[in-house]
């Protein structure tokens, strides 16, 4: 049994002992100062984040999935990051998946006891038909959530890659993952409230993992999200701007190719850059494994 009082995320913050006596302005300054520490803490963890991204790219190239698992705030952040990959990078909802202890209901309300079940984490991956091509990333600010540990142990059993993300050093979940990430943000502004600095650190790291792994499989050209899915009016206009930025064409030219490409931004860009029709552009992209740059050779 882990003594929770020894965890950094459970310790009291010396800077905020008199929090209830501060003015709103004083509390804001203190909270902002604490938040400033997060990016520097994440910077210290960069060497351990890199192999997780490399593993995610490898998983995608083999047809595997990136699966986030967590409870409470940690689980919600995983679900959020996974959901954003669909419109941003044009991947199917089955490629990056967020699982939260207690299921969809736990996104909005607490599901008692769910995070304390080793078996539930295991069962959720069984239900997902986890295979050896997948990467499972267990997220737990405390670093000791049984739901996450059960999932990581099952993933290792079947030969899937495993990674963990904790906001405590020497975390228990680090012992259960091939690629552990530990980020020390110090005690929380409000004692034990890991939705604060810990949650911010987790979101920054998940942003890195999903975004840079997508770059690694050709979802980005220069710094443009060329596989964006235009699911609303704002994204339709953004898609046209992306085509213009990538090719230096006019708005009218971008709109024309966007329509010819059946609203496929990447295809429209290739059509303009290589002066080809839609079908030839599709062939070029297949040969280039989806990388726009490789269609220009």
Curated annotation (Swiss-Prot):
Pfam families: GKRP_SIS_N. Gene3D superfamilies: 1.10.8.1080, Glucose-6-phosphate isomerase like protein, domain 1 (3.40.50.10490). Residues 56-219 form the SIS domain. Its EC number is 4.2.1.126. GO terms for molecular function: carbohydrate derivative binding; carbon-oxygen lyase activity; ether hydrolase activity. GO terms for biological process: amino sugar catabolic process; N-acetylmuramic acid catabolic process; peptidoglycan turnover. The active site is at residues 84, 115. InterPro entries: Etherase_MurQ, Glucokinase_regulatory_CS, MURQ/GCKR, SIS_dom, SIS_dom_sf. Pathway: Amino-sugar metabolism; N-acetylmuramate degradation. It is an enzyme of class 4 (lyase). Specifically catalyzes the cleavage of the D-lactyl ether substituent of MurNAc 6-phosphate, producing GlcNAc 6-phosphate and D-lactate. Belongs to the GCKR-like family. MurNAc-6-P etherase subfamily. Homodimer. A lyase-type mechanism (elimination/hydration) is suggested for the cleavage of the lactyl ether bond of MurNAc 6-phosphate, with the formation of an alpha,beta-unsaturated aldehyde intermediate with (E)-stereochemistry, followed by the syn addition of water to give product. This is N-acetylmuramic acid 6-phosphate etherase. It comes from Lactococcus lactis subsp. lactis (strain IL1403) (Streptococcus lactis). The lineage of its organism: Bacteria, Bacillati, Bacillota, Bacilli, Lactobacillales.
């Amino acid at each position: 049994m882990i003594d929770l009082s020894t965890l950094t995320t459970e310790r009291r913050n010396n800077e905020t002992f008199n929090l209830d006596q501060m003015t709103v302005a004083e509390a804001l300054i203190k909270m902002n100062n604490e938040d400033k520490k997060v990016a520097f803490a994440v910077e210290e963890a960069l060497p351990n984040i890199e192999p997780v991204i490399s593993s995610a790219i490898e998983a995608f190239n083999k047809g595997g999935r990136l699966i986030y698992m967590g409870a409470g705030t940690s689980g919600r952040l995983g679900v959020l990051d996974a959901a954003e990959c669909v419109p941003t990078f044009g991947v199917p909802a089955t490629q990056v998946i967020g699982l939260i202890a207690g299921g969809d209901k736990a996104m909005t309300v607490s599901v008692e006891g769910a995070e304390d079940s080793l078996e539930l984490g295991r069962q959720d991956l069984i239900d997902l038909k986890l295979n050896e091509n997948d990467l499972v990333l267990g997220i737990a600010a405390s670093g000791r959530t049984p739901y996450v540990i059960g999932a990581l142990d099952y993933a290792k059993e079947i030969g899937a890659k495993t990674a963990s993300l904790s906001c405590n050093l020497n975390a228990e979940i680090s012992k259960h993952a091939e690629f552990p990430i530990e980020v020390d943000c110090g005690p929380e502004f409000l004692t034990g409230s890991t939705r604060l600095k810990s949650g911010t650190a987790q979101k920054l790291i998940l942003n890195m993992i999903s975004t840079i792994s997508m770059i690694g499989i050709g979802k980005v050209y220069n710094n443009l999200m060329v596989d964006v899915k235009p699911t609303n009016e704002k994204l339709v206009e953004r898609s046209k701007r992306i085509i213009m930025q990538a090719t230096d064409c006019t708005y009218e030219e971008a709109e024309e190719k966007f329509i010819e490409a059946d609203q496929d931004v990447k295809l429209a860009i290739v059509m303009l850059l290589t002066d080809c029709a839609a079908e030839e552009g599709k062939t070029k992209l297949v040969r280039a494994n989806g990388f726009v740059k490789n269609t220009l050779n």
